[in-house]
């Protein structure tokens, strides 16, 4: 398995993965919305937001895991996409927050849309995606990573906590929320400092 920037040929797989992973959750989006978003990232290109994918080589996909497949030099230059994540470095690429306490700094790196195919979970892919985002942020001159996670999602919350992310704030519930049975789980904003030398200057 390897993590790399998404390619044009990955669009369909990425859309399928995101739609399946978030189906039935508070963060589900129409397929047309996801398609437009992924195409904008992968095909059109955006220097302020990037999509990464976790890719299984061909032998790994056949065997359902790593092992021998990882020893193949490049058995699948276009292996199966089993993970997806985005990272942005500008508030312009992110939807505005109603609660200002839930807004990451405008010029901070923001991790979002992390998901792993159901058939590939518990293989360390989520951790690999997070680590790849952090490596990319450092390479670009950033010093920290911010993200949001739902408080009713124990697996990703445990992953981020285990990787050193700390809670910054929690979303306030709307006074009218839940009156008609549509109560949403609150989000938690988290941050991880990648370096503490005071230098945080993205180079585009």
Regions found by a protein language model. Give the residues of each.
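A short beta-loop-alpha structural element at the N-terminal edge
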Residues: 2-16
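Active-site rim helix/loop that mediates acceptor-substrate recognition in acyltransferases
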Residues: 22-76
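Short hydrophobic/aromatic beta-strand element in the GNAT-like acyltransferase core
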Residues: 49-53, 84, 113, 146, ...
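Conserved acyl-donor/pantetheine-binding loop and adjacent beta-alpha core of acyl/acetyltransferases
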Residues: 60-65, 69-113, 174-179
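A short, internal acetyl-CoA/4′-phosphopantetheine-binding micro-motif in the GNAT/acyltransferase core
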Residues: 103, 112-122, 149-150
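Conserved acetyl-CoA-binding loop-helix of GNAT-fold acetyltransferases
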Residues: 122-136, 158-162
């Amino acid at each position: 398995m390897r993590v790399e920037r998404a390619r044009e040929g990955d669009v369909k797989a990425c859309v399928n993965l995101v739609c399946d992973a978030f189906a039935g959750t508070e963060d589900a989006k129409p397929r047309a919305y996801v398609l437009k978003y992924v195409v904008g990232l992968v095909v059109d290109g955006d220097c302020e937001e990037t999509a990464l994918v976790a890719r299984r080589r061909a032998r790994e996909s056949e065997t359902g895991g790593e092992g021998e497949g990882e020893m193949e030099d490049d058995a699948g230059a276009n292996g199966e996409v089993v993970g997806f994540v985005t990272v942005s470095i500008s508030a312009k690429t992110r939807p505005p927050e109603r609660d200002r306490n839930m807004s990451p700094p405008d010029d901070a790196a923001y991790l979002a849309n992390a998901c792993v195919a159901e058939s590939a979970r518990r293989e360390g892919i989520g951790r690999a995606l997070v680590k790849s985002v952090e490596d990319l942020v450092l390479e670009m001159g950033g010093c920290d990573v911010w993200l949001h996670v739902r408080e009713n999602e124990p697996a990703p919350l445990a992953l981020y906590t285990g990787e050193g992310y700390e809670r910054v704030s929690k979303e306030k519930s709307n006074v009218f929320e839940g009156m008609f049975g549509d109560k949403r789980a609150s989000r938690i904003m988290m941050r991880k400092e990648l370096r503490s030398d005071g230098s945080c200057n993205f180079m585009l």
